[in-house]
Amino acid sequence: MTDALPTRSRLVAASLEAAGIAGTIIVLPDAASTAALAAAALDIEVGAIANSLVFWSDDEPLLVMTSGAHRVDTAALAERIGRGDIRRATPEQVLAATGQPIGGVAPTGHPAPLTTIVDEALAAFPQIWAAGGTPHTVFPLTFDELVRLTGGTVAKVD
């Protein structure tokens, strides 16, 4: 079944399988490149979307997995996690760091592991959904699986 997935999504599927996470990547008929579009396509609350945002901090990429209902307060987050300035990565930096385009960045399947922060608000949902490597692909998992998959640090991000 993974043969029918886009190449980038196959890398994500392999990473999920290696981590023992059963979430199956599904292909949506229309692009869901924002949390609101993904939530509408899945008929779920926008807060249950694990939005993958790539920032640049201390000369390296920083992946923030935030609830689709939140905006990241970069100044507050930098202080909470002991980082210097946190700024949005450029599309080129996102692609170089993740191998995936903006709007489809998965929490896994990257060329190298990324320092990851996971929004504590995602713990409120029994199931969350994340992008599967393209704007047309998504997969379900639990909060605990997301933290384990990414090796992320749980923090308040808004």
Per-region residue spans from a language model:
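Extended, low-hydrophobicity, polar/charged segments
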Residues: 1-158
